[in-house]
Amino acid sequence: MNFNKIDLDNWKRKEIFNHYLNQQTTFSITTEIDISVLYRNIKQEGYKFYPAFIFLVTRVINSNTAFRTGYNSDGELGYWDKLEPLYTIFDGVSKTFSGIWTPVKNDFKEFYDLYLSDVEKYNGSGKLFPKTPIPENAFSLSIIPWTSFTGFNLNINNNSNYLLPIITAGKFINKGNSIYLPLSLQVHHSVCDGYHAGLFMNSIQELSDRPNDWLL
């Protein structure tokens, strides 16, 4: 995947980037997303929720350069043209998990079939990352279906300057006739601000309200 190097000296975020990189400042935001329309459409079509969630999040991540900005393996700052999802799958026997990735296509059904194939192949492997090599342009997301939450944070030793976003969802919450998904976004402040966090959450909600635009 193409990596576009950033000329830091002439970058509009230079001062912000250097300040928050030196401070190693990350932040997380958690919102309840109304997935009522999305969930009902998914069930009507006979799909599983998790791959639809992965596809939706990846689409939003790839819509903004800020979410795709990081360091490549050569230590160069830049942004990828596209990110791929590295997501967790749970092993019901060992009660552990693995992280695998599946390339996202423009067509949801094509991605859905690839997802099912990868899960069948790698679930129960006993390895943390059974599908290798993991591409450089991969971001992390997961879902914790056993509990809901109003806040979530990952404490990372960030000596390697990991700048890509991390997305975590929780157990559905039923409120009347509506279904809500707790959703947490964790970002590095050197590349993402509150503005970008708001864009992310609002875009997730908008696409959840219009699943026919991308699900079918």
From Swiss-Prot:
Q: Which SMART domains match?
A: CAT (SM01059)
**PROSITE patterns referenced in this protein's UniProt entry, alphabetically:** CAT
Reaction equation(s) it catalyzes: chloramphenicol + acetyl-CoA = chloramphenicol 3-acetate + CoA
Membrane spanning residue stretches:
none
Pfam families xrefs: CAT
Query: Do you know what upregulates this one?
Result: By subinhibitory concentrations of chloramphenicol.
The EC number(s) given in the record are 2.3.1.28
Keyword list (alphabetical) reads: Acyltransferase, Antibiotic resistance, Plasmid, Transferase
State the superkingdom: Bacteria
Coiled-coil features, chain-numbered ranges: none
**Catalytic center at which residues?**
H189
GO terms, molecular function: chloramphenicol O-acetyltransferase activity
Q: Which GO terms describe its biological process?
A: response to antibiotic
Give the matching NCBIfam families: chloram_CatA (NF000491)
- Complex and partners: Homotrimer.
Family statement: Belongs to the chloramphenicol acetyltransferase family.
Function of this protein? This enzyme is an effector of chloramphenicol resistance in bacteria.
- What protein does this entry describe? Chloramphenicol acetyltransferase
